């Protein structure tokens, strides 16, 4: 988020978040959205894999929010994060990623940008198809999806303790 402002995805979905629902902000960064959720009376928890040194745990919550996380990690890590998100979700997950940006040097299924960071850009359909491996029901979140971002709402998380990890 820019300079202490809540993220665009949170601004778009905030009205659909119930005060009695537990919310897990997975990939919270500096915690701006998390702090806003707490300040507005929501029951929220947050974790960021970068600041927690990969120690984000499954945290069962009614709603999981993950904004601009999946597009910043390579495939193997992305799969682990998606399993954590699915395992943490009781009701629904809101997932938003970058759709466009700096296309530097090809690496894995994305790019190393001019800032030396990894980015995987997803079209709305690519994100929907990818997340369906982890949830039984995903649809494009048209209120958040725009020229820069792709977003989905997912329900019916699949059980990953039932599957072997690759």
List each model region and its residues.
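Class I (Rossmann-like) S-adenosyl-L-methionine-dependent methyltransferase catalytic domain
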Residues: 1-59, 84, 92-166
């Amino acid at each position: 988020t820019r300079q202490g402002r809540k993220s665009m995805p949170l601004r778009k979905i905030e009205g659909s978040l119930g005060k009695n629902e537990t919310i897990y902000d997975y990939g919270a960064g500096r915690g701006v959205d998390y702090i806003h959720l707490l300040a507005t009376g929501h029951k929220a928890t947050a974790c960021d894999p970068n600041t927690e040194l990969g120690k984000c745990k499954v945290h069962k919550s009614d709603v999981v929010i993950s904004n601009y996380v999946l597009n910043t990690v390579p495939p193997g890590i992305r799969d682990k994060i998606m399993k954590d998100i699915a395992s943490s979700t009781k009701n629904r997950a809101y997932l938003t990623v970058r759709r466009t940006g700096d296309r530097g040097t090809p690496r894995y299924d994305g790019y190393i940008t001019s800032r030396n960071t990894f980015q995987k850009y997803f079209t709305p359909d690519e994100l929907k198809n990818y997340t369906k491996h982890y949830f039984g029901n995903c649809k494009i979140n048209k209120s958040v999806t725009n020229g820069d971002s792709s977003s989905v709402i997912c329900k019916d998380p699949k059980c990953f303790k039932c599957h072997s990890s690759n």
